[in-house]
């Protein structure tokens, strides 16, 4: 949820943010009206409760002659208080709905526009020049790494098996990511992948993108599409001590996405699938530290990409392509030779205080135990995921159909070269 102080002091800033996202700026006026109505309802209810309390005291001290009139007034006030409390509850509900409808306020400098309006911040390496390159699925099948056919037989479209050295390649990649995270002060975590509705909603994934989320109806639980979700809920309703700096966690989990809005897109291979594995960095910090921490997350992502030795670019994602929780997002996109374009491998988002406000995650300024709790900031960033296999296989392929294993992954895979294998049963 957005900061009400900003809304009240500078509503035009929130309107501009909505417009840059391509979202409805009139929602800002609806929230302002709901905020005013809520405060008025609270004031009315408080006034009536105070009058009711005073009237109750008067009844006790009244003479027999005065008591009937005072009792009648007390009864009338009780009915008015009940009605006022009902009106307050309705106003609170309307306010909460209006508050939840507004996306995070975009940070100044984020490009306006939609998916194609990003700004390129950096390009690293030259696009790999290959004559008649094979795509990652052809390579994965010929090398005995990926089995889409049996994945579809067992689970349906957009499922797969990683087999043999394909499994080792992914496990090595994720272990490398976790190792880098630990070296930089992250606490490794293996979180639950089923979460309660309030946690999923708190991270902002039950709004416009609710159809992308798997729900276990019998238990009223959701399968997570990223370990960002359970890690954001980890400190819900807590007051943190950030006096020693940010709290950093690295979650390793399977992730699940319905891809309901992606019909017909990336149907070949493991670019867009229903289940994948990922190491996700998640950070709690003070709002003042958030932008610097965002740059640090991007730096660690770039370090991981350097280790897998692929050309990539960094983009500043346009406001209209941001999720509702993100105030700014950087993507690192690797070159995919068979598509002759860059595809997203990592994203890192600065969610400012948006998620923490929903989840009631606070900190005490300066670590002062008596200080007033403040809303924390949260950030997240991919450190390694299944999709990276696409970039590794395609960029390191050789004319004979083999694939060179990036040096950093050789100890995990057990070989420097992946070579075609014969068909198996």
Curated annotation (Swiss-Prot):
**Role of this protein:** Catalyzes the attachment of serine to tRNA(Ser). Is also able to aminoacylate tRNA(Sec) with serine, to form the misacylated tRNA L-seryl-tRNA(Sec), which will be further converted into selenocysteinyl-tRNA(Sec).
Q: In which pathway does it act?
A: Aminoacyl-tRNA biosynthesis; selenocysteinyl-tRNA(Sec) biosynthesis; L-seryl-tRNA(Sec) from L-serine and tRNA(Sec): step 1/1
Q: Where does L-serine bind?
A: 226-228, 280, 382
Example of a GO cellular component annotation carried by this entry: cytoplasm
Q: Which reaction does it catalyse?
A: tRNA(Ser) + L-serine + ATP = L-seryl-tRNA(Ser) + AMP + diphosphate + H(+); tRNA(Sec) + L-serine + ATP = L-seryl-tRNA(Sec) + AMP + diphosphate + H(+)
Top enzyme class, one word, equals: ligase
Which organism was this protein described from? Mycobacterium avium (strain 104)
Q: Name one GO molecular function term.
A: ATP binding
Comment block on domains:
Consists of two distinct domains, a catalytic core and a N-terminal extension that is involved in tRNA binding.
Lineage of the native species? Bacteria, Bacillati, Actinomycetota, Actinomycetes, Mycobacteriales
Binding annotation for ATP: 257-259, 273, 344-347
Biological process GO annotation list? selenocysteine biosynthetic process; seryl-tRNA aminoacylation
Give the matching NCBIfam families.
serS
**Location(s), subcellular:** Cytoplasm
Among PANTHER family, the record links this protein to: SERYL-TRNA SYNTHETASE
Reply yes or no: does the keyword Nucleotide-binding apply: yes
Family to which the UniProt record says this protein belongs: Belongs to the class-II aminoacyl-tRNA synthetase family. Type-1 seryl-tRNA synthetase subfamily.
Predominant localisation class: cytoplasm
UniProt key word Acetylation: no
Recorded hits in InterPro entries, A to Z, give:
aa-tRNA-synt_IIb, aa-tRNA-synth_II, aa-tRNA-synth_II/BPL/LPL, Ser-tRNA-ligase_type_1, Ser-tRNA-synth_1_N, SerRS_1_N_sf, SerRS_core, tRNA-bd_arm
Pfam families the record matches: Seryl_tRNA_N (PF02403), tRNA-synt_2b (PF00587)
Q: How does it assemble?
A: Homodimer. The tRNA molecule binds across the dimer.
Per the UniProt entry, the Enzyme Commission number(s) are: 6.1.1.11
In its UniProt entry, what is this protein called?
Answer: Serine--tRNA ligase
